[in-house]
C-alpha cells in the first residue's frame, strides 16, 4: 500500500492511497478520512456514482467536519478498475472505466478485472484491517446513484457485516434501467438469475433483507423517472421487515450540491446505528 497524499482537516487526516488489487488485477486507489481519535473508530464506506472516482466526494461531499465531530472513518473507494490493460469503452460513460456497477463480472474479458463487489466487501476491508486500528466490527455503508445501488446490494447480501445503510438517489433496479441494463448484459451475460444478485429490488423480492434503509432523492433529478425510480424499492419493501425511510426532497437534482446538503444527516444517522 502506497500513500499518495495526506492533508490535515478538522483535526483529522484526509489521505489517498493506492495498492495492488488481486481481485481486479490492477492498482486501485481509495480516499480515507480518519477523525482525530482514529483508534477503534467505526467505518462508513461511501460508494460513488457513474463517471466518478474517489476524488469527487473527497472534494465536494463536505463530510469531514461532521465525521470529525462524530469520530467516523470515511472510506471512499474508486468506482472501477483502471489502467491501459483494462477492457473499456472510452466513449461510453455508462460502462467500463468509472462504471463498474459494483458487481463481479462473469463474462470474458471483463471477469479478470471488474470484480468490484468482492473488492469492496472483502479485499479492501482486509487491507484496511491490516494497516489501521479501526473497529472492523462496526462498519456501515452508503453511496450515490450507482454507488447507492452498490450500497443497497451489499447491505442486503451482507446484513451482518454492515450496521446501517443509506443512499443518495440510488439506482434501485439496475437490471431494467436504461443506463445500466446494457452494462449488466456485457458484464454478466444473459443469465438473469445472476443479474438478480446485483439488483436490490430483485434481492428483496427473493427474500433478502436489511433492518433499516435511509434514502434521499431529489425531485428535480433528471434521472428520476427512467434511471432511479425509488418507488420500485418502496413497493418491494412493503410487507417485509425492512424499515425504508424514503425522503423525496423538492428542488434538488442529482449533483453534489444535493449530496452535500444531506451528507451530515446521513453521517449522524449512521453514527446512531453503528
Give the residues covered by each predicted segment.
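Non-catalytic cap/lid and distal C-terminal segments of serine-dependent acyl enzymes
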Residues: 1-274
Amino acid at each position: 500500500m502506497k500513500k499518495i497524499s495526506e492533508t490535515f482537516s478538522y483535526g483529522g487526516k484526509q489521505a489517498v492511497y493506492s495498492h495492488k488489487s488481486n481481485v481486479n488485477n490492477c492498482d486501485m486507489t481509495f480516499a480515507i478520512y480518519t477523525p482525530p481519535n482514529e483508534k477503534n473508530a467505526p467505518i462508513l464506506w461511501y460508494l460513488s456514482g457513474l463517471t466518478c472516482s474517489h476524488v469527487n466526494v473527497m472534494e465536494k461531499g463536505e463530510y469531514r467536519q461532521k465525521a470529525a465531530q462524530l469520530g467516523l472513518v470515511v472510506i471512499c473507494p474508486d468506482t472501477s478498475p483502471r489502467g491501459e490493460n483494462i477492457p473499456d469503452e472510452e466513449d461510453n460513460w455508462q460502462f467500463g472505466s468509472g462504471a463498474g456497477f459494483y458487481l463481479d463480472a462473469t463474462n470474458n474479458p471483463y471477469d479478470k478485472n471488474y470484480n468490484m463487489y468482492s473488492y469492496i466487501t472483502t479485499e479492501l476491508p482486509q487491507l484496511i484491517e491490516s494497516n489501521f486500528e479501526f473497529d472492523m466490527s462496526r462498519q456501515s455503508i452508503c453511496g450515490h446513484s450507482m454507488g447507492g445501488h452498490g450500497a443497497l446490494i451489499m447491505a442486503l447480501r451482507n446484513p451482518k457485516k454492515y450496521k446501517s445503510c443509506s443512499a443518495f438517489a440510488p439506482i434501485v433496479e439496475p437490471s431494467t434501467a436504461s443506463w445500466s441494463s446494457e452494462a449488466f448484459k456485457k458484464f454478466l451475460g444473459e443469465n438473469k438469475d445472476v443479474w438478480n444478485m446485483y439488483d436490490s429490488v430483485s434481492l428483496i423480492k427473493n427474500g433478502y433483507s436489511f433492518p433499516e434503509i435511509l434514502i434521499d432523492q431529489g425531485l428535480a433529478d433528471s434521472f428520476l423517472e427512467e434511471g432511479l425510480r425509488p418507488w420500485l424499492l418502496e413497493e418491494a419493501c412493503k410487507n417485509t421487515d425492512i424499515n425504508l425511510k424514503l425522503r423525496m426532497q423538492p428542488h434538488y437534482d442529482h449533483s453534489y450540491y444535493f449530496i452535500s446538503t444531506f451528507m451530515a444527516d446521513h453521517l449522524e444517522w449512521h453514527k446512531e446505528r453503528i
